[in-house]
Curated annotation (Swiss-Prot):
Residues that coordinate or bind a divalent metal cation: D8, D9, S39, N91
Any one GO MF annotation of this record: 5'-nucleotidase activity
InterPro entries the UniProt entry points to: SurE, SurE-like_Pase/nucleotidase, SurE-like_sf
Catalysed reaction, written as an equation: a ribonucleoside 5'-phosphate + H2O = a ribonucleoside + phosphate
GO cellular component: cytoplasm
Entry's cofactor comment: Binds 1 divalent metal cation per subunit.
Protein EC: 3.1.3.5
Listed transmembrane segments: none
Enzyme class of the recorded protein, top EC level: hydrolase
Subcellular location: Cytoplasm
The protein's name: 5'-nucleotidase SurE
Family: Belongs to the SurE nucleotidase family.
Length: 249
């Protein structure tokens, strides 16, 4: 099996090194990741300049682009052999609920949908790497197990891992996405020349984080697995349009 590994924390981040080390003796792994932190890049592509891959001393490929750029190039000619699956992470920080809309970690896995199989995105609920060994072990076990799982084509598994030692992980739960409350207001700053700017505030707290959600699972010490799909069509809203379009044109 050939696995393409990417992330949004950057090619030198400890999470991607831990993920590669965990999977390298299970599959043929290649790493293509951004040359700098691209957290919050979502599914953006770089269209205003060329992308320049650079192979580092450890064999990882660094790219001056987004996580989606990395996987896009990896699936479309940069590599000699097309990967069989995409695995993203290990992100230092949660990707729960609405986070999946902005997450470069999840976006990298979503770009892997063109392979037709299942892609996986891993996140650890900590900005510190202390429990990366836990996350790496769980990532390996789930990558090994996913071949036995029959899912619809182009499914992405969004996996969040509590910031705990392995012996304190209570198990794994299948969850739905929760929802966050609105974020706080941006922080206004003024540079020495008097020019105003803003720092985006941190994500809001869980507004819908009850039992069954990804928020609830990880807070209870469980690994959360949420199956995602690209189709965001709001099918239940269709009936509300009955008669509304008549006479619009």
């Amino acid at each position: 099996m050939r696995i393409l590994i990417s992330n949004d924390d950057g090619v030198t981040a400890p999470g991607i090194a831990a993920l590669h080390a965990a999977l390298a003796d299970h599959a043929e792994c290649v790493v293509i990741a951004p040359d700098q932190d691209k957290s919050g890049a979502g599914s953006s592509l770089t269209l205003d300049r060329p992308l320049h891959p650079q192979t580092l001393a450890n064999g990882f490929i660094s790219l001056n682009g987004t996580p989606t750029d990395c996987v896009h190039l990896g699936l479309n000619g940069l590599l000699e052999h097309t990967p069989d699956m995409v695995v993203s992470g290990i992100n230092l920080g949660a990707n729960l609920g609405d986070d999946v809309l902005y997450s470069g970690t999840v976006a990298a896995a979503l770009e892997g949908r063109f392979l037709g199989g299942t892609s996986l995105a891993f996140s650890l609920l900590s900005r510190l790497p202390d429990n990366l060994p836990t996350a790496a072990y769980i990532a390996r076990r789930l990558v090994e197990a996913q071949s036995r799982l029959e899912l619809p084509p182009r499914t992405v598994l969004n996996i969040n891992i509590p910031n705990l030692p392995l012996e304190h992980i209570r198990g794994i739960q299948l969850t739905r996405l929760g929802h966050r409350a609105r974020a706080a207001a941006p922080t206004k700053v003024v540079n020495p020349r008097g020019k105003e700017g803003y720092w985006i505030a941190v994500a809001g707290d869980a507004e819908d984080g009850g039992p069954g959600t990804d928020f609830h699972a990880v807070m209870q010490g469980y690994v959360s697995i949420t199956p995602l799909q690209l189709d965001r069509t709001f099918n239940d809203a269709f009936e509300r349009f009955d008669g509304w379009l008549e006479g619009v044109l």
